[in-house]
């Protein structure tokens, strides 16, 4: 007997934060809807979708990370910054690399393009930074009537975003004061140096709780009897009947059997590389599919606060600082086109002398993220003659930095040194440019557009052009070049799509009720 339903109202492919947002909004606005969520990876945390940082036991947390690494579960991952600087091509714990096709001859490629396969997706492993986009990062056609800010606020509600979880971190005010002196002049109030908005909260006992898909699901989804979550389930294609999405074909990875689930609506939220893969495998191939792929070049540097003393007391769950204690934000602006994520650390990423002890929180890790110069030629393509470890069309990344990209990266290197000197004493000889793909913020591959002009995959409600009933979700929907962490924006766009489905479900139900009443009469 199949563990899948034969028919539902909505199928959601993928269980990351955006897939969870669809489930949450539909549970709130269409409580009678039958929803099936399908995830290729296993359940690695409790409740399902919870962030692995919330797992207290180190060994159990490590097992959860390994189980998230899909077909590369036993492959070595990065354990320290030195491995990256030494040129080792490794994924972070909880993720796995695209093993082939990540770069083509004469191109830059994305050498560390990575995935996570688990309930919660990368939302079980992320840094939880949730800044709002600014200036050219914003989506103009959603800004005209003020829709974007309301959607971002709703995204913050679903993700549980706060800005005060690290208020007790030592020296964070000093770090922000020194950064502000360098960059705040002539900036509007909302784009000045400030605390980083994070999807994290501190419990009454002092312990930090990091948001994953479990927080986005919320109690309303978990209590929804019409909602079901199926892990270890590979969606191989979206079914289309009479030009409209009509369901999915799914392979049960536990026994290898294939099943079909009929649905009124299908939402593909598989990530920015696998969502276009599912559409391609389904024969749904709009001109912009997989194109406008963009990552954020990432430059890192470290400095040390020298003129500080260890605080008399240290607040927190067990008295220890988290590695992200004192997270500060230098917002993107068009004049300074970088997103700055500044983290205070307990330990130095650079070896220090044995007789030079580190004051907790005095090591400052600076990271600047650069927005990509968008071009249609940057894309993930698919090879119908070859398959990946899951049996899906093999990916081929085409990705090239433009002259403008290289100029922005050089400017970012100068800027991060300036900021590092402003904060304290630099620990690095020079800035380090992370391998392309390191940000994990891949965007644009199923991008949203205001018109069906061949330059976008979906409409402003995330519905795929020309395929009614098929919606896409995730960072790939974002149509602008962003430098900030994209999760909040992606969840905000998912909220809009979910509302549209809820409206249609309500309208269809009302029509069916009227039709039934007329027939009975």
Language-model features: where?
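FAD cofactor-binding and catalytic pocket of flavoenzymes
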Residues: 90-115, 119-122, 286-406, 439-444, ...
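Conserved redox-cofactor binding core of oxidoreductases
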Residues: 63, 73-82, 88-92, 106-108, ...
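N-terminal Rossmann-like FAD-binding beta1-loop-alpha1 element of flavoenzymes
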Residues: 10-37
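A conserved FAD-binding loop/helix module that cradles the flavin
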Residues: 480-501
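Glycine-rich loop(s) and the adjacent beta-strand/alpha-helix scaffold that form part
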Residues: 28-60, 64, 238, 249-318, ...
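Conserved N-terminal glycine-rich FAD pyrophosphate-binding loop of Rossmann-like flavoproteins
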Residues: 42-75, 79, 114-128
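A glycine-rich dinucleotide-binding beta-alpha-beta segment and adjacent secondary-structure elements
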Residues: 194-199, 230-231, 236-241, 407-481, ...
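Residue-level detector of alpha-helix initiation sites
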Residues: 16-17, 273, 477
